[in-house]
Amino acid sequence: MTLPYLQVPCLEDAEEFVKGLSIQKTKKQMIQRLNIKELKEQTRLKGNKMEFASLSYLFELKNGIASTGIDRIPYKRNENWIPYIRPSYRQSTSIDAYVNRNMFMDDEIYPKNTLYVSTNGQGSHTFSYVSVGDFVPNSDVTVLIPKRVMTLKEKLFYAMCITHNRFKFSYGRKPKGQKLAEILIPIRMTEKFDNINVYNIII
């Protein structure tokens, strides 16, 4: 049953509906039903078949570069000009502009097969992708650097897992900073995903 169809007593029957109920007793019962351990964010959670960890357990989070003062053009002038990536609900539309790689520090430019997350935009937050070439992320994109060696297939798996957490966020509750870092994801790639031909899922 969804919220719009939830049945509640009408105003005239409200008094009879709550008659005999104790607020203190109800609060006590609610507290007793809580599992405090489950409410605490854990670094690692172990389920029946899968072990989970926070995003920051597996990745180092790197914020993108603000567009202020950056020289951007709408086309690739030559090989020195690389995509400046913005949030998007599709990877094909995530190129905001092209920027000259010589204007950035080496650690501000990320290589092909880098995992990144959109952290802003009502229709684009939380969507995650693996880059198809060198790029510079804008300030509404977070780059994820694996803390262990990962294959391309593993990065695509984690991009899918992160995107599946989209329902937890909104334009008013953006997946930035600690909120993004605390997303729970599997520690290892599932066997089902491992059996997929990676070339069938690359956009």
Segments the model singles out, each with a brief description of its role:
Residues 167:
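Extended, Lys/Arg-rich, non-catalytic nucleic-acid recognition/anchoring regions
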Residues 2-3, 135-142, 172-197, 201:
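A short glycine-rich beta-alpha junction/loop motif
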Residues 89, 121, 148, 187-189:
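Short, flexible loop/turn elements at secondary-structure junctions
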Residues 97-161:
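A short beta-sheet element
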Residues 72-74, 106, 174:
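Beta-strand elements of modular eukaryotic interaction domains
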Residues 80-83, 113, 140, 181:
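Structural beta-strand/beta-sheet cores of well-ordered domains, especially the beta-sheet scaffolds
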Residues 1-93, 190-203:
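Non-catalytic DNA-recognition/assembly elements of restriction-modification systems
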